Amino acid sequence: MLLTTKYVDGLPLHRFEAVLSRHGIEIPRQTLARWIIQCGEHLQPLLNLMRDRLLESPVIHCDETRVQVLKDPDQDPTSQSWMWVQASGPPDRKVVLFDYTSSRAQDVPLRLLESYRGYVMTDDYAGYNALALQPGVGRLACMAHARRKFIEAQKVQPKGKTGRADIALTMINKLYGIERELKDGSDEQRFIGRQEKSLPILAQLKSWLDKTQSQVTPQSVLGKAVNYLANNWSRLERYTEAGFLPIDNNAAERAIKPFVTTRSLCTSF
């Protein structure tokens, strides 16, 4: 119950301490924190098995988010630390692992995914570049990130007028429409469907991108969206190489969302 209350329900320990107190149970939050640490120590063998299973996956989704830890002896309490998530596995046997570090450097994903061979789905953070250079590792980029950037560009267009952001979004939305059509198919059916339907749209999008990039201001909202698309193009289109590859990193973002909710309710970890 303690672990579920903190990490699933997002209830900080000082609030859980108050809940218990209202029911006549006096347990200091320091004791609750110690119990959580002890649980983690007992669960370590299970975590090791989960990591082994994760590293067997053909695709691993990766993401990271900021967290402030006041009582970390290795750093200033005002500095930022990071929570890294790795998610993978089939729907009935999903594996989601979280790792806390005080660094966002590229050696972190190298350590977390040491000896991994397969595809990694990430955002465009440069900290994953070294991992992507490892033998047998292919890097995918998140189409949802690209779409969000064009949505932001669409918001600053003159009202009632269709602009370049709309053109890009129309093509990206078509790609997602194809993914919905192929969702329940086999990997082979998905691969064939992408080759027949998605590749022509990607070719149109790339042609539009090549023509448009030189016509936009790089620091404008639209320019940033266009440059994101251009800088990550090979990683964005790579999902068409196989039917089991994802189009975006939503699996990692969904996995990390409960932690983000908990973080918003806590002053620190």
Please annotate each region the language model reported.
Residues 1-269:
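Catalytic center-proximal scaffold of phosphoryl-transfer enzymes
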